[in-house]
């Protein structure tokens, strides 16, 4: 009963509508019992196919190509099923696109009604070929006949008039160019005869890659010029600044030299001042006779006593004038200046009357060389030192015989010569070697012994002690003036 109920519902729209037979007489109207099942999975066996289609109706015969035991590798298989009832074959077509194992089945009625042999069956393996086994009006959409004669038509026959009759009516000439027969030079001639049409190209044919390199070079050159110009401008503006800096640095270094109590520098300054003063006095002394020296020294002693006070006043006035315009390194320079000048004054006064320590105070006190000594002051200092030396000699000459004094003078002069010759002005500027300094330190120690003899002899004068006290009071007053 299930067959009879299902068959009419399917037979009405399906095969009965196709062949044109009546609803009941669909089977007699040329229906077939054999179906062709393509796109069967290669892993499917004939037993599985039998079970699948056995639900639809009684199966007379079932064959699977290639068979299960075939050694050939198979992409897909073909199965032919012959039902006992042709209606069950119609129902089986509904299994089309049913996925079996891993593929969708294609079920088509086979027109011949007999299961074919293996060779023919394998030719129908492809789904497109499977359609060729259908009846001309059966089942699926009709397929047009294959165009076997396309390759036989020559290309020359496919001109413009043959393709479209409307083009032939326009009277256009046919194609007269055969690219195979034309040579390259002929093509060039042909192209030269044609009038050129100029159209602006939207995209650049040659990519401008070189532009970036050239532009970068130009930029670099321009930047170089800019840098050169900047350097020139700065060079034109800054030389004044550089000179100022140099001046500042020089003044600073000078002030530092004043501050630092390095013994080597003080030695240099002492030797310089001594050399200048003694060199002139020596030359004069050598030219003069001892008698003349004595008379001159007495006169000079008197003069120096009278004129020393006036000189001190002049110096104070000059210092006041200078203090109105203080330099940058004012405080340090002023201290050093005032101290050095006071020491000089003390020496000038006390050295004339109290010759207890003729040389030793000179070494200790005149350490800081005043940086801005004028030529006039230098000359005055030289005169003072000359007068001092001559006074010392005159006092000692009174108490000792002439012969002894001459010997001493020779000795002292020779010692001074040794001292002053050892030092060079240029060498002082460049910097002293440690060995020279050691030698020079030894020499003053050796030369100090004859001077101490003179000191012991010259202590006896009583009036010198009194006058030194008076001088001390004067120095206190001068110190007060300087501090003001």
From Swiss-Prot:
Residues of the region (Disordered) are: 1-33, 233-484
The record, for PANTHER family, names: SERINE/ARGININE-RICH SPLICING FACTOR (PTHR32343), SERINE_ARGININE-RICH SPLICING FACTOR 11 (PTHR32343:SF6)
- What are the Phosphoserine sites (modified residues) in this protein? 207, 212, 323, 414, 434, 449, 456, 464, 483
Q: sequence repeat ranges? A: 247-255, 258-265, 267-274, 275-282, 285-292, 293-300, 302-309, 321-328, 334-341, 346-353
Kindly list the biological process annotations in GO that this record carries. mRNA processing; RNA splicing
> Where is this chain primarily localised?
nucleus
Q: Which InterPro entries match?
A: Nucleotide-bd_a/b_plait_sf, RBD_domain_sf, RRM_dom, RRM_SRSF11
The Swiss-Prot or TrEMBL record describes its family as follows: Belongs to the splicing factor SR family.
Q: Where is this region: 10 X 8 AA approximate repeats of R-R-S-R-S-R-S-R?
A: 247-353
What GO MF annotations does this protein's record show? Answer: identical protein binding; RNA binding
- Which protein, by its recorded name, is this? Serine/arginine-rich splicing factor 11
Q: Where in the cell is it found?
A: Nucleus
């Amino acid at each position: 009963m299930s067959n009879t109920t299902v068959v009419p519902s399917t037979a009405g729209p399906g095969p009965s509508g196709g062949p044109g037979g009546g609803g009941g007489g669909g089977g007699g109207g040329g229906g077939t019992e054999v179906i062709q099942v393509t796109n069967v999975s290669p892993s499917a066996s004939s037993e599985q196919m039998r079970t699948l289609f056995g639900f639809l109706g009684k199966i007379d015969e079932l064959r699977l190509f290639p068979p299960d035991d075939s050694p050939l590798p198979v992409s897909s298989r073909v199965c032919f099923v012959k039902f006992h009832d042709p209606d069950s074959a119609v129902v089986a077509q509904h299994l089309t696109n049913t996925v079996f194992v891993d593929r969708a089945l294609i079920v088509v009625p086979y027109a011949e009604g007999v299961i074919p042999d293996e060779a023919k069956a394998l030719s129908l393996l492809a789904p497109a070929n499977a359609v060729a086994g259908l009846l001309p009006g059966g089942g699926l959409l009709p397929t047009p006949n294959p165009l076997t004669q396309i390759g036989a038509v020559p290309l020359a026959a496919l001109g413009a008039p043959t393709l479209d009759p409307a083009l032939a009516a326009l009277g256009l000439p046919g194609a007269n160019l055969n690219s195979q027969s034309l040579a390259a030079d002929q093509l060039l001639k042909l192209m030269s005869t044609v009038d050129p049409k100029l159209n602006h190209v939207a995209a650049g044919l040659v990519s401008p890659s070189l532009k970036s390199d050239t532009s970068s070079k130009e930029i670099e050159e321009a930047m170089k010029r800019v840098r050169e110009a900047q350097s020139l401008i700065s060079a034109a503006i800054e030389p004044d600044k550089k000179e100022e800096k140099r001046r500042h640095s020089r003044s600073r270094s000078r002030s530092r030299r004043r501050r630092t109590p390095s013994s080597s520098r003080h030695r240099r300054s002492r030797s310089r001042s001594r050399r200048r003063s003694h060199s002139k006095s020596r030359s004069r002394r050598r030219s003069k006779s001892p008698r003349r020296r004595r008379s001159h020294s007495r006169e000079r002693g008197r003069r120096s006593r009278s004129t020393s006070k006036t000189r001190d006043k002049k110096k104070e006035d000059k210092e006041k004038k200078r203090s109105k315009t203080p330099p940058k390194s004012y405080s340090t320079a002023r201290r050093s200046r005032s101290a050095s000048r006071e020491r000089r004054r003390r020496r000038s006064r006390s050295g004339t009357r109290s010759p207890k320590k003729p040389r030793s105070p000179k070494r200790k006190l005149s350490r800081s060389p005043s940086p801005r000594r004028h030529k006039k002051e230098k000359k005055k200092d030289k005169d003072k030192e000359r007068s001092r030396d001559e006074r010392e000699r005159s006092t000692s000459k009174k108490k000792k015989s002439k012969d002894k004094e001459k010997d001493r003078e020779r000795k002292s002069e020779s010692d001074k010569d040794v001292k002053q010759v050892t030092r060079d002005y240029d060498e002082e500027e460049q910097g002293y070697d440690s060995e020279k300094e050691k030698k020079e330190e030894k020499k003053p120690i050796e030369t100090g012994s004859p001077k101490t003899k003179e000191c012991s002899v010259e202590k006896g004068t009583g009036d010198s002690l009194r006058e030194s006290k008076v001088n001390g009071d004067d120095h206190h007053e001068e110190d007060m003036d300087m501090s003001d």
